[in-house]
């Protein structure tokens, strides 16, 4: 009769062994090593520590039975981070919270307990750790099939969520696109699925509820007109609108936006950082020039150099009683090729600030001015005169005529002055056909025809 073999496999044997070893440690029996962390003593067994940590295995294997070697100092570990790891070695249960997770992660990395370190990293990346007690219930993750050991996570409200030590992929939170301080604006999207509010008042990261809707929104094509670039010539956005127009548009947007429209705006807003051009520091030095409005006194003083059509319209708009002075920061590149490029960047942004009456009266004049090409290069040089008062924003008169060397504080004045050297007279009277260099002269000439008629 053959020999019969019976094999018994106990699933609870490992847990019972760990429990008994933990009892021996708590009672102080058979403890052969002392761990000192921040002047606090912990008794443990070498075999358990060496089996759990490669750091302790390297330290303890091959040592002689010397009394002084039984005390091991851990200088780069805190008590708050070491106690959960010691409990994990004897119970296979890791208890962490928002207060000690940083210390536990640092201690696990130092002690070469990489499975625990990856678990802490997954907790920090997940949204479970940083949710408030008033938020939705935390999702519990299923235990891994290969590793049956579980990690208990203690949240702020005291609930424990079992998570496998392997910490499978947790649903990632969608990062919120944060604009720069100069471009930071209030952006509100009303959606029935997941309302999101991104504004300057919110400092905590917002989480979108539905990841499927986010993927669907990302798959939609992005409108090139809405995905605005971050920098414009001379700091002027060509889609800038008056304050009243912006308020009216925001009111219409918040009333009843469609689902597709809201989803498209979320996709455009999230992708704004990806479209941001990154330039190395020091590639191009920009000269910052603040354009101030012309007061009534300055207009009378500069009769010898009247303003152009665009600036006269801007001055008329700004001198209306009750209107606020409009100021714009211009970034003038020293590498600008010609005045024509400068004129395109400025004149395309200025008509949005003009009044309705001035736009209708001088629309033809603006078209003539935009079609003029100036064969002169813009020369911006620092002031060399010792008598001029230094300015914190740069030279007081950064714009210099390349023909006669006269300096101006405003680029519009330089363009008007250069028309004299070029001999171009783009402004023509509709009644008599007489041509003028400046729009102001044409405007005064038209008054004569109006008086005669």
Swiss-Prot record:
Pfam families: BTB, zf-C2H2. A zinc finger (C2H2-type) spans 399-421, 427-449. The keyword Transcription applies. GO terms for molecular function: DNA binding; zinc ion binding. Residues 304-318 have a biased composition (Low complexity). The modification Phosphothreonine is found at residue 200. It is found in: Nucleus. Residues 135-157, 241-266, 295-324, 336-366 are annotated as: Disordered. One of its GO terms (cellular component) is nucleus. Keywords: DNA-binding, Isopeptide bond, Metal-binding, Nucleus, Phosphoprotein, Repeat, Transcription, Transcription regulation, Ubl conjugation, Zinc, Zinc-finger. The modification Phosphoserine is found at residues 135, 159, 161, 165, 191, 194, 199. Residues 31-98 form the BTB domain. It comes from the Eukaryota. This is Zinc finger and BTB domain-containing protein 44. It comes from Mus musculus (Mouse). The gene is Zbtb44.
